[in-house]
């Protein structure tokens, strides 16, 4: 896996396919850049898809603490290191929060946004769910195995960092997407399924859609939050049409 030095740390990333660059952000505790290589090779090979691991997670060195803005600054610095001036960003869940903040803080770097199954804001219920699901001592064996697969033997350290990062007040404020949606200038496609759930509420997608002036909202019937993994051919076809029509 390639590694570049950004902001004083080494940042791992994958680069898949050929063609115009596209940045993909997922960035959760139960995945990594390597998880998405096969998917991108199969469904997004018309692009050169850049998939980073964020500071403190997956293939990167563990850190005891970081600021939420570090994840955005590191992503911007990665694009600079790869000599990518501006790029469409496809993101899901936590990655959507990083992507929107990147578009607001570094508008020249983001030519378009695609937000799949986004999480728009923090809430106490979500923080409690995350702590129950992923913290050592409460995570079930299936979740531990998933974290071990992508975070390695230091999964517990990564999980504690991930959960505590989400519980910071600075995280909640910085990544409050409805509060900053009006500052997004990039054309934006929001996708999700119509089956609601507490971790990825439909209301989060509609709130961001209402705030971003140049946005499309696509809701797939009889589908859970993640359209990309449930209907990959349809998702990437829609992404291609969106990027073509808004270029």
What is the predicted role of each segment?
Residues 184, 190-192:
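Short beta-strand/loop motif that positions the catalytic acidic residue
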Residues 97-105, 110-142:
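Flexible "cap/lid" loop of the alpha/beta hydrolase fold
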Residues 91-96:
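Conserved alpha/beta-hydrolase "nucleophile elbow" surrounding the catalytic nucleophile
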Residues 197-204:
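Conserved alpha/beta-hydrolase "acid-adjacent" motif
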Residues 41, 50-90:
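Active-site loop/oxyanion-hole signature of alpha/beta-hydrolase fold enzymes
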Residues 9-61:
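Conserved HGGG/HGGXW glycine-rich cap/lid loop of the alpha/beta-hydrolase fold
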Residues 215-247:
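Catalytic active-site module of serine/aspartate enzymes centered on a nucleophile-bearing elbow/loop
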Residues 164-180, 186:
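Active-site nucleophile elbow and catalytic-triad environment of alpha/beta-hydrolase enzymes
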